[in-house]
């Protein structure tokens, strides 16, 4: 079964090569048939050039270089729909969740789940390393509670950049995705559930990197408003969903 690893990248020239080496080395040693797709989101640094150079050493690596910035959700969608794998994982360019965490997700695909998401929010589980600013901890907890009550019940952490989809789920969900920036993860999960796909949340190890985080305190109200719009669009039939 072929695996596609999609990596959205914006101004990641300092991190991307080490992440690519780690992913390729791991999958090669495990003899996993795979492709690695980096989708550059209008980066202002040398991210695309670094990936182009890495292709010489990593034969399974592909680059989609988008010249204008559209947002993480947009480039994840581009990568997912360009992928050829029966399984499709998106993961962050800073390697906050290392590829070996895939071993935690795969058993649930074998059990029949269609979407398996990495989480550091499950009760009784501790998967986070590194400190976060106090505002992110507070807003994160309040935001997750809000989401469970009003948007998508039963999911404790929607925001980890480590999500695995079957090809069937990916090709059904991503064409309906409207949100290109923050909150696209929530939209994907809402769409997956509405389309009848089985979702499993699994504890993973995640290392916070404050230097690579692009989230500001002012982003949280926008995030919540976008989530409310997802619910509104779903209720009013603006998503034309047919599984």
Regions found by a protein language model. Give the residues of each.
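Hydrophobic helical membrane-anchoring modules
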Residues: 1, 145, 150-153, 176-243
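A conserved acidic beta->alpha catalytic loop
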Residues: 40-49, 95
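Acidic helix N-cap motif at the loop->helix transition within catalytic regions
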Residues: 14-18, 45-54
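Conserved donor nucleotide-binding strand/loop of the catalytic core
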Residues: 34-37, 48-82
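Acceptor/aglycone-binding surface of glycosyltransferases and processive sugar-polymer synthases
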Residues: 66-82, 87, 99-182, 208-215, ...
């Amino acid at each position: 079964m072929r695996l596609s690893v999609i990596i959205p990248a914006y101004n990641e020239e300092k991190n991307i090569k080490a992440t690519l080496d780690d992913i390729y080395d791991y999958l090669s040693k495990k003899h996993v048939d795979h492709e690695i797709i980096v989708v550059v989101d209008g980066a202002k640094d040398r991210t695309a050039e670094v990936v182009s150079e890495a292709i010489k050493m990593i034969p399974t690596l592909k680059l989609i270089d988008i010249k204008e910035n559209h947002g993480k959700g947009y480039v994840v969608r581009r990568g997912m729909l360009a992928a050829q794998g029966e399984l499709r994982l998106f993961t962050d360019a800073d390697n906050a969740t290392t590829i070996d965490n895939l071993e935690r997700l795969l058993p649930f695909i074998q059990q029949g789940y269609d979407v398996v998401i990495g989480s550091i929010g499950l009760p009784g589980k501790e998967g986070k390393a590194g400190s976060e600013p106090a505002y992110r901890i507070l807003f994160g907890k309040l935001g997750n509670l809000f989401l469970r009550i009003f948007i998508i019940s039963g999911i404790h952490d929607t925001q980890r950049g480590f999500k695995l989809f079957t090809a069937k789920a990916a090709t059904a969900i991503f064409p309906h995705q409207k949100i290109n920036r923050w909150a696209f993860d929530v939209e994907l999960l809402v769409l997956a559930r509405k389309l009848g796909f089985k979702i499993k949340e699994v504890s993973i190890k995640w290392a916070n990197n404050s230097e690579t985080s692009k989230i500001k305190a002012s982003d949280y109200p926008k995030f919540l408003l976008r989530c409310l719009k997802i619910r509104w669009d779903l209720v009013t039939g603006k998503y034309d969903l047919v599984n």
